[in-house]
């Protein structure tokens, strides 16, 4: 997927979340997926409660790191979605309907793999309350994703030459969400 399309999707998601804040006073929370942090993919998200049992969220992940010349994993990912909370928003059980768009490139030795991922899924999570403002939320989700994969030598992926011969893609069932999220409630 082209970067301009990705940027448009992110802007629409941000606009949607911001427009919901004018409805009435909201609770807002900042989130970070600790599992992504462990694999050196810093991420940050925002969740806005717009009804007693409903919230919208937007998360971004970026991994620009190149560990060595022979091993690297670069990633840019955006996730937006809707949560239905069974009791009260930001507490206890909830269902998740979300979409994700990811562009990633990994390299080891002289071989490189690039993929683009566009998926949507349904998930479940539970919010463990640590204190008044801090929650820990494990969640998991499954769904369908369109994955496009490019395979070749490292120098071919950077220039684009020779990559077209090794392109594969298609729809497949996938684990669309696996998270251990630390959530800080702002208000």
Region annotations inferred by a language model:
Residues 27-29, 63-64, 105-109, 160-167:
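Extracytoplasmic loops and strand-loop junctions of Gram-negative outer membrane beta-barrel proteins
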Residues 82-86, 172-187:
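Outer-membrane beta-barrel "beta-signal"
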Residues 48-138, 184:
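Gram-negative (and chloroplast) outer-membrane scaffold detector with strong preference
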Residues 1-11:
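Bacterial N-terminal signal peptides that target proteins for export
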Residues 20-25:
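Sec/Tat signal peptide C-region and signal peptidase I cleavage site
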Residues 26, 38-40, 72-78, 114-120, ...:
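Residues that define the transmembrane beta-barrel architecture of outer-membrane proteins
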Residues 9-19:
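Bacterial N-terminal signal peptides
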Residues 30-37:
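Short strand-turn segments of transmembrane beta-barrel domains in outer membranes
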């Amino acid at each position: 997927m082209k970067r301009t399309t990705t940027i448009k999707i992110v802007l629409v998601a941000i606009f949607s979340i911001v427009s919901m804040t004018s409805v009435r006073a909201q609770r807002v929370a900042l989130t970070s997926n600790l599992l992504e942090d462990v694999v050196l993919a810093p991420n940050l998200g925002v969740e806005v409660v717009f009804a007693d049992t409903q919230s919208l969220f937007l998360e971004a992940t970026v991994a620009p790191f190149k560990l060595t010349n022979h091993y690297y994993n670069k990633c840019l990912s955006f996730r937006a979605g809707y949560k239905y909370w069974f009791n009260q928003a930001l507490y206890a059980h909830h269902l998740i309907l979300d979409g994700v768009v990811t562009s990633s490139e990994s390299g080891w030795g002289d071989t490189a793999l690039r993929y683009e991922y566009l998926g949507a899924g349904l998930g479940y999570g539970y919010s463990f309350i640590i204190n008044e403002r801090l929650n820990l939320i494990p969640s998991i989700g499954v769904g369908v994703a369109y994955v496009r994969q490019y395979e070749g030598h490292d120098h071919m992926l950077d220039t684009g030459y020779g990559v077209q011969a090794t392109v594969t893609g298609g729809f497949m069932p996938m684990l669309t969400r696996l998270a251990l999220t630390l959530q800080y409630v702002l208000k």
